[in-house]
């Protein structure tokens, strides 16, 4: 069973609402062109409609630290589809899966600050077929330090469950995603990969 986590892991230090606005001031052009959203997916097409959700604080900002772990929740798909992830100057294509899962990536080096996008690579395309999940990686305002510490610790706990299954309801509640419960099965397999060094 998934180890107990607070029902709301952000209750320790709730991120203040102005956080995203502060991030926008630090890099106004890029974040204005690319608004943050933790969930991706469309409403049409078997592939494009697949749910993709980042495990990041509710404000969409994540400082992954010196040993980055990135987490993505994938919904069910009628066809096996690879998962595309890209950030700063790097891009990864994870193996195709059909069923819903929790994917975790342990990276070999710190990630350069910038946007992180994830989406299903439909028919081998490397451009999003629908709005992607989009978060901002890198150090944020000092007020977000506690939330990022909780996020990193929770990702490490999840990494310790690689190859097992986790309770979906508990996972979603911990990451403020309870509204997605009806789109996912009761448990999710934890699929872990350690990409080879490349780019960021």
Stretch-by-stretch model annotation:
Residues 89-101:
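Solvent-exposed serine/threonine-rich low-complexity stretches and specific carbohydrate-binding patches
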Residues 103-105:
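Short strand-edge motifs at loop-to-beta-strand transitions and within beta-strands
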Residues 60-77:
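Contiguous beta-strand segments within globular domains
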């Amino acid at each position: 069973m998934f180890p107990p986590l607070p029902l709301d892991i952000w209750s320790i230090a709730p991120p203040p609402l102005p956080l995203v606005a502060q991030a926008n001031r630090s890099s106004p052009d890029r974040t204005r062109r690319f608004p943050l959203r933790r969930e991706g997916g469309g409403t049409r097409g078997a592939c494009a409609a697949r749910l993709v959700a980042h495990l990041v604080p509710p404000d969409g900002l994540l400082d992954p630290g010196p040993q980055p772990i990135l987490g993505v929740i994938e919904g069910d798909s009628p066809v096996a589809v690879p998962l595309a992830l890209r950030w700063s100057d790097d891009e990864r294509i994870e193996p195709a899966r059909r069923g819903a899962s929790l994917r975790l990536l342990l990276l070999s080096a710190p990630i350069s600050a910038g946007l992180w996008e994830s989406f299903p690579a439909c028919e081998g395309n490397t451009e999003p077929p629908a709005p992607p999940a989009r978060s901002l990686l890198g150090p944020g305002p000092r007020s977000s330090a506690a939330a990022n510490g909780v996020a990193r610790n929770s990702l490490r706990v999840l990494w310790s469950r690689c190859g097992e299954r986790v309770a979906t309801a508990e996972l979603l509640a911990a990451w403020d995603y309870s509204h997605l419960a009806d789109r996912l099965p009761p448990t999710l397999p934890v699929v872990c990969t350690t990409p080879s060094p490349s780019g960021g």
